[in-house]
A protein has these predicted regions:
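N-terminal pre-catalytic "stem/leader" segment of glycosyltransferase-like enzymes
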Residues: 1-74, 81-84
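Carbohydrate transferase catalytic cores enriched for Leloir-type hexosyltransferases
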Residues: 4-12, 64-67, 77, 90, ...
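Short, hydrophobic beta-strand segments that form beta-sheet elements in well-ordered domains
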Residues: 5, 28-33, 63, 116-119, ...
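Membrane-proximal helix-turn-helix segments that form the acceptor-binding/catalytic region
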Residues: 51-58, 78-83, 96-117
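Helix N-cap/beta->alpha junction signal
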Residues: 67-69, 93, 121-123
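A short, active-site helix/loop in glycosyltransferases that binds the activated sugar's phosphate group
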Residues: 99-102, 114-137, 174
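Short beta-strand->alpha-helix junction loop in the catalytic core
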Residues: 139-150, 169-171
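Conserved catalytic-core segment of nucleotide-activated headgroup transferases in glycan assembly
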Residues: 152-194
Length: 194
């Protein structure tokens, strides 16, 4: 069974890393290899992808879609099923949490169009199940970003335990970071992000 994915260049590192990993794993890109510039460029590249998808999918393929896929998600799922393909979605974030543009029932309905969901952790899986999601799910458990930097083989133990956080630093999405002083005074916190 052949596998494919839709590459849509994003400002989101996690999504871009998944595109790279899918390519390395032999998945066929049915998206765009062109990196658009500006809102109008992005709109036309995405529109081109949406229009060509029905002609790029082959019977019995597995299509991986990264979520959120803001527009045309349900359309893509329907086209893939019409072409007798299986649809797998890797969830990075849920719209009902992220910006509350979707209600929880709307999101669950949107996700009901797929065959399998890959979630980040058991908590996300449990939450989706509690909200009525019936789609089979698997957990990544941990998501590591790709890096050109060579990993350190040995890290010396320090007298003060260290906690390292890498990710978004904005208070809107990560308010807990601004409340840690009250809880981890005996730890050294190293924060990486913007």
């Amino acid at each position: 069974m052949n596998k494919c994915y839709i590459e849509i260049h994003s400002t989101n590192k996690a999504k871009n890393d998944i595109d790279i990993l899918m390519n390395r794993a032999g998945y066929r890109n049915i998206g765009s290899s062109k990196k658009p510039s500006g809102k109008i460029g992005k709109f036309f590249v995405k529109l081109g992808i949406i229009l060509k998808i029905p002609f790029c999918l082959h019977k019995n393929e597995i299509l991986l879609i990264q979520y959120p896929f803001k527009k045309y998600y349900t359309y893509l799922c329907r086209v893939a099923h019409f072409r007798k393909c299986k649809v797998v979605t890797l969830i990075h974030d849920l719209g009902s949490f992220r910006r509350q543009k979707l209600t929880v029932p709307q999101e669950i309905k949107k996700l009901s169009h797929i065959d399998y969901i890959i979630v980040h952790n058991p908590s996300m899986k449990r939450w989706l199940e509690e909200q009525g999601c019936k789609v089979p799910m698997g957990c990544l458990e941990i998501f590591d970003y790709l890096s050109e930097t060579k990993a350190i083989d040995y890290c010396p133990v320090t007298s003060v335990p260290q906690v390292i956080y890498a990710g978004g630093l904005g208070p809107r999405k990560n308010a807990f970071l601004y409340q840690l002083d009250d809880h981890i005074s005996s730890y050294e916190l190293n924060v990486y992000g913007k």
